[in-house]
């Protein structure tokens, strides 16, 4: 065996090669810390593997913010997330990093973000119309094309990491904790993304992946939305996950993919993969979801959910698909919020409309000796995991 065949991204291949080193060399990044006394925690929104997330108030201007208190991880990982958020700040539909502070007692870093009035996706997705799905998918694509054009892969695209304020039709791509800079020829860790959204490249341990990983994850989101099946590929572990995919896309194309890149398949797959034909997307349509499905939706989905990462649409190509013609037409007519890339302006006045008069929450006071770092549970009550708790 001569090892796997190398692969390079079809687009934005050399973005980081042409940037100064300080753009992507996050280990050398010097973090500028803000003042933690400016923030007062209000309530816990949820917890993720790497963080706890709180709603808070910036007491200098009474604006709502979200504070993500990072659990102890390698400094390198924290610096990577900060550098990526700073590089992407102001991009279309990218969550805005407002400040970085440190608790004086525990020395725990905390990231302060713009506040998004999110609706839990499990509730929201059940109510979305065909047009809504097209609209929000297009908004995610703006964020993905932007971060890819900036030489960055998100690597954790999933509903929990897409905040939607449905009332204002505002979307933000959050949780850049697994994001990484793309360097052609580099081999990356395959232990990224969440199981149901992991691309085949991760499941077969192919490390020279690229931005196209995010496009697979987006395809999984689209399938779950139009077919009303959450998640669409429901594996019980990482091995079963590939089996679930193979039962839909077929084993023949999987073996073609493995052969093309000279991938050595884990012997554990021998007993569980079996032989499966490729299924037509139409077989997932039924009376409850048919109003969300159209020929162009299925064509678009088919061009995302491909084993071969090089065969998937890029974010920019996806935005030009007929599935989005009505959305593009409407945004052009509305002048696209007068912003490049059609994003909602990220001025604090616009972000915080209607909440600038929120009174400072006096009952809580500074928590656990610090306005940022809370006691175990500041509200003294069970906190359900919020959508986006993985942030």
Swiss-Prot record:
Q: Which residues form a coiled coil?
A: none
InterPro entries listed in its UniProt record: CK2_alpha, Kinase-like_dom_sf, Prot_kinase_dom, Protein_kinase_ATP_BS, Ser/Thr_kinase_AS
Q: Where is the Protein kinase domain?
A: 39-324
Question: Positions modified as Phosphoserine?
Answer: 362, 370
> What's known about how it's activated or inhibited?
Constitutively active protein kinase whose activity is not directly affected by phosphorylation. Seems to be regulated by level of expression and localization.
Provide the GO biological process annotations. apoptotic process; chaperone-mediated protein folding; DNA damage response; double-strand break repair; negative regulation of apoptotic signaling pathway; negative regulation of double-strand break repair via homologous recombination; negative regulation of proteasomal ubiquitin-dependent protein catabolic process; negative regulation of signal transduction by p53 class mediator
Gene Ontology cellular-component terms for this entry are:
cytosol; nucleoplasm; nucleus; plasma membrane; PML body; protein kinase CK2 complex; Sin3-type complex
- What is the recorded post-translational modification? Phosphorylated at Thr-344, Thr-360, Ser-362 and Ser-370 by CDK1 in prophase and metaphase and dephosphorylated during anaphase. Phosphorylation does not directly affect casein kinase 2 activity, but may contribute to its regulation by forming binding sites for interacting proteins and/or targeting it to different compartments.
* Keyword set, alphabetical order: Apoptosis, ATP-binding, Biological rhythms, Cell cycle, Disease variant, Intellectual disability, Kinase, Nucleotide-binding, Nucleus, Phosphoprotein, Serine/threonine-protein kinase, Transcription, Transcription regulation, Transferase, Wnt signaling pathway
Subunit info here reads:
Heterotetramer composed of two catalytic subunits (alpha chain and/or alpha' chain) and two regulatory subunits (beta chains). The tetramer can exist as a combination of 2 alpha/2 beta, 2 alpha'/2 beta or 1 alpha/1 alpha'/2 beta subunits. Also part of a CK2-SPT16-SSRP1 complex composed of SSRP1, SUPT16H, CSNK2A1, CSNK2A2 and CSNK2B, which forms following UV irradiation. Interacts with RNPS1. Interacts with SNAI1. Interacts with PML (isoform PML-12). Interacts with CCAR2. Interacts with HIRIP3.
This chain belongs to which protein, by name? Casein kinase II subunit alpha
Organism of origin is Homo sapiens (Human)
Source taxonomy:
Eukaryota, Metazoa, Chordata, Craniata, Vertebrata
Gene name, per UniProt, is CSNK2A1
